[in-house]
Design a protein with these regions (language model features):
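Conserved SGNH/GDSL esterase-like catalytic core that processes O-acyl groups on lipids
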Residues: 40-46, 50-129, 135
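Alpha-helical cap/lid subdomain in secreted, periplasmic
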Residues: 95-216, 228, 237
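Conserved catalytic region of serine esterases and O-acyltransferases that act on ester linkages
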Residues: 184, 207, 211-213, 217-264
Length: 264
């Protein structure tokens, strides 16, 4: 009873000390971290449902812990389904979080930004605004280079009529993310490269649930790619495997991440 009361008291104190912008999950983790004497590494992820699906940030923390990282990853996120960079710029919470101060800030764009002109224009216009608003202790913000949809999605009439398929979309994603990274001084996280490697070398592993959103395997792959860049090292030593994923599939996904460049 006393332990539960103490945990509740600590959570309330943290809520006032670290600000009401923090999510419930982040506050619970910070309460638990009071018993962890490793130095903290604060990470903010600004993104969409691709990030909150299967609680990818929690996977990232578990991956880091299982790999014996010397830091405890304290991860906060501002994520909304279908959110564009323009959407995030209009969100008071996102802007307040960016201004709080972090060791790392990760920007994960809308999945369809490169499928239409206005979406790509907003991506290139508001990405730099978010990056400039990020208060970092050192380094620069990071941009997730995400995966294109599954091939079947491009059979829709508008895509088919324009001759816009998966390979064209992937190429445009790479080009526009490279441009934004150059314009806004961002590091790029090579999720797309790991995704393609896993998709081609292990086609039996289902990475999406609907052609877009990640399965548990897809979220694990995404989190591994993020960790590989944050730690600037291989993920072969990661032992964490999420529920619902076999050890063999998890090993194959770790190998896919280690087979592609971490830095772009």
């Amino acid at each position: 009873m006393r332990i539960g009361f103490l945990a509740l008291t600590l959570a309330v104190m943290l809520w006032f000390n670290f600000g009401q912008q923090s999510s419930a999950g982040a506050m619970i983790q910070r309460s638990a971290d009071l018993l962890d004497d490793r130095p903290a590494r604060s990470i903010l992820i600004v993104g969409t449902s691709r990030t909150f699906q299967n609680d990818m940030p929690a996977m990232l923390r578990a991956i880091a812990d299982s790999a014996g990282n010397p830091n405890k990853f304290q991860i906060e996120s501002s994520t909304y389904g279908g959110a564009t960079f323009k959407t995030h710029w209009s969100k008071k919470r996102t802007r307040q979080l960016l201004a709080t101060g972090w060791d790392d800030v990760i920007l994960q764009p809308e999945s369809g930004a490169q499928t239409w002109q206005q979406g790509n224009d907003d991506f290139l216009s508001f990405g730099p605004k978010l990056a400039a608003a990020a208060q970092l202790s050192s380094g620069r913000p990071r941009l997730v280079v995400g995966w294109p949809y599954d091939s079947k999605a491009y059979e829709e009439e508008d895509y088919a009529a324009a001759g816009f398929g998966r390979s064209e979309h992937l190429q445009l994603i790479k080009e526009m993310h490279a441009k934004l990274a150059s314009d806004a001084n961002l590091d790029r996280i090579n999720v797309a490269g790991a995704w393609e490697r896993a998709r081609l070398s292990n086609p039996s592993i289902q990475l999406t649930s609907d052609g877009n959103h990640p399965t548990v395997a897809g979220s694990y792959l995404y989190a591994l790619a993020v960790y590989a860049q944050l730690s600037n090292g291989p993920v072969a030593q990661v032992t964490y495997v999420p529920d619902g994923l076999s050890d063999n599939d998890a090993k194959a996904l770790r190998e896919a991440v280690d087979a592609v460049p971490r830095l772009l």
